[in-house]
From Swiss-Prot:
The protein, known as: ATP phosphoribosyltransferase regulatory subunit
Gene: hisZ
HAMAP family: HisZ
Pathway annotation from the record: Amino-acid biosynthesis; L-histidine biosynthesis; L-histidine from 5-phospho-alpha-D-ribose 1-diphosphate: step 1/9
Record bears the keyword Nuclease: no
Note: This function is generally fulfilled by the C-terminal part of HisG, which is missing in some bacteria such as this one.
Subunit: Heteromultimer composed of HisG and HisZ subunits.
Functional description taken from the UniProt entry: Required for the first step of histidine biosynthesis. May allow the feedback regulation of ATP phosphoribosyltransferase activity by histidine.
Cellular-component GO terms for this entry: cytoplasm
Subcellular location(s) per record: Cytoplasm
Length: 383
């Protein structure tokens, strides 16, 4: 086997792509900071039980596992940073009020999510802890939309769902609860024939409500249809009220309701949301409320957040990240060194062409040159 080959669905990030990813990372983290979010950096490696808290079977299957040579315990390479940030909030920071945290880091998956998807994503996201009201959900959704607009993704559609709708249906009928993750996955995939088969032996009220979920998709008016077709349970009514409020308040995106968009249902406890853009079949960002995740770390806290894959967003972003630069000669001399240093201190990219390599600068747009005029080094437009 050639030594330069990489595993399937693993790839190097080359200069042009890396520059674009880094540009977006800085933009987004700066915007998170402008909203008051503090940066945290969880480790890539943790004990497996910490990484899998509340994540369900899907997260377990996506997590690489290995044995710690020091303790003999099973370790995992993180497949999602969200549980790690919940651990930091619950166990390390231990604050009583509202905490806003953000992060950016690599995650590894045992299996790709799609045919051409990478197994090494660069996950970036933000989380709010300590406020159970819809104000936190609204803020995190607006921050996500702001981040996508900063990335140059113009027309964004926001799909809203609520975990309490399915939760109320399942909790009211033990036979439905026994279907477990197969039910969630079938609804998320909108596999109507399989859903019909799975629910065949359920009581009519629960059966009809579950079969209605994939069809309850559309603008905010579909909520009235949902009220008519779903049981009049308090939990369902509150969930639909929450969605109606958010659909009215969110700005900067087309808002749709999708009561079967249940990806990540395993650890969500309230409003769930996904962002879509034209020409991309899968969501470019996802988020939602997960108030119970902190329980495993000894302290349950109201929590909501979102995340996205920077590599995927960079791939579809129209932002041009090619850097303009100043081309300087390679010469000895204090005056030239001083001029180059001053330009770099001012934030300019200055490339000194090594002898014999004046034209090997394809990755940079050298639109200016540093030339000597009357004993002074000055910047001029490149002819």
């Amino acid at each position: 086997m050639s030594t330069w080959l990489l595993p399937e669905n693993i790839a190097d990030v080359l200069p042009s792509e890396a520059r674009k990813i880094e540009e977006l990372r800085r933009r987004l983290l700066d915007r998170f900071r402008a909203y008051g979010y503090e940066m945290v950096m969880p480790p890539l490696l943790e004990y497996l039980e910490s990484l899998l808290t509340g994540g369900g079977r899907d997260l377990n299957l996506r997590t690489f596992k290995l044995v710690d040579q020091l303790s003999g315990r099973t370790l995992g390479l993180r497949a999602d940073i969200t549980p790690q940030v919940a651990r930091i909030d619950a166990h390390l920071l231990n604050r009583q009020g509202v905490t806003r945290l953000c992060y950016a880091g690599n995650v590894l998956h045992t299996r790709p999510r799609g045919l051409h998807a990478t197994r090494e994503q660069i996950q970036i996201g933000a989380e709010i802890y300590g406020h159970a009201g819809l104000e936190a959900d609204l803020e995190i959704q607006q921050l996500m939309l702001d981040a996508l607009h900063l990335a140059g993704l113009g027309r964004v559609r926001l799909d809203l769902c609520h975990a309490a709708v399915l939760g109320a249906l399942v909790d009211s009928e033990p036979a439905a609860a026994e279907l477990g993750e197969s039910l969630y996955e079938t609804l998320a995939g909108k596999d109507v024939p399989l859903l019909t088969e799975l629910t065949a032996n359920l009581p009519p009220v629960t059966r009809d409500a579950l079969r209605a979920l994939p069809t309850l998709y559309g603008d905010a008016t579909v909520l009235e249809e949902a009220r008519a077709r779903l049981p009049n349970a308090p939990e369902i009514s509150r969930a639909l009220d929450d969605l109606a409020f958010l659909a009215q308040q969110v700005g900067g995106a087309e808002v749709m309701i999708d009561l079967a968009d249940l990806r990540g249902y395993a650890y969500h406890s309230g409003v769930m949301f996904s962002a879509y853009v034209d020409g991309v079949p899968n969501a470019v960002a996802r988020g939602g409320r997960y108030d119970k995740v902190g329980q495993a770390y000894g302290r349950a806290r109201a929590a909501t957040g979102f995340s996205l894959d920077l590599r995927e967003v960079a791939r579809i972003s129209p932002i041009e990240a090619r850097s303009s630069a100043i081309l300087a000669p390679w010469q000895a001399g204090e005056a030239l060194r001083t001029s180059v240093a001053a330009l770099r201190d001012a934030g300019e990219v200055v490339i000194q062409a090594l002898p014999g390599h004046d034209h090997a600068l394809d990755e940079f747009a050298c639109d200016r040159v540093l030339v000597e005029r009357d004993g002074q080094w000055v910047v001029e437009l490149k002819s």
